[in-house]
UniProtKB/Swiss-Prot annotation:
Belongs to the universal ribosomal protein uL16 family. HAMAP family: Ribosomal_uL16. One of its GO terms (biological process) is translation. One of its GO terms (cellular component) is cytosolic large ribosomal subunit. Keywords: Ribonucleoprotein, Ribosomal protein, RNA-binding, rRNA-binding, tRNA-binding. It comes from Bacillus cereus (strain AH187). GO terms for molecular function: rRNA binding; structural constituent of ribosome; tRNA binding. The lineage of its organism: Bacteria, Bacillati, Bacillota, Bacilli, Bacillales. This is Large ribosomal subunit protein uL16. Pfam families: Ribosomal_L16. Part of the 50S ribosomal subunit. Binds 23S rRNA and is also seen to make contacts with the A and possibly P site tRNAs.
Length: 144
């Protein structure tokens, strides 16, 4: 599972997910990418499930880049505990994803294989996604 090696503080504020992604909105490493269409928290378990679905479909061929990292801790209180008495214990790690962010990239496989692998990965994620291709001039084409 992905998680930071060490953090300065064990607990963080939840924050707001306003606006679009500032960086990472173009296919940089691979040929095809999976782009988020909405804002969401994506847990380290969801990232791992999506990665497994992609690599299993591609039969270990090609290369996969994971462009998001779960660096934000989220907390939860135990069941049947009354309100108050402090913030809950750290429960897991999430990556904050905003609209436009490329989450996964693939290279070394055909477009049909990449499209299906990224479709399987998108089903593991709690956010609506779009398949994008790298353009020759450096950007990506927004074809669905």
């Amino acid at each position: 599972m992905l998680m930071p090696k060490r953090v300065k503080y064990r607990r963080e504020h939840r924050g707001k997910m306003r606006g679009r992604a500032k960086g990472g909105t173009e296919v940089a490493f691979g040929e095809f990418g999976l782009q988020a269409q909405a804002a969401s928290w994506i847990t380290n378990r969801q990232i791992e499930a999506a990665r497994r679905a992609m690599t299993r479909y591609m039969k270990r061929g090609g290369k996969v880049w994971i462009k998001i990292f779960p660096s934000k801790p989220y907390t939860a209180k135990p069941l049947e505990v009354r309100m108050g008495s402090g913030k809950g214990a750290p429960e897991g790690w999430v990556a904050v994803v905003k609209p436009g962010k490329i989450m996964f990239e693939i290279a070394g496989v055909s477009e049909e294989v990449a499209r299906e692998a990224l479709r399987l990965a998108a089903h593991k994620l709690p956010v609506k996604c779009k398949f994008v291709k790298r353009e020759e001039n450096g950007g990506e084409s927004n074809e669905n």
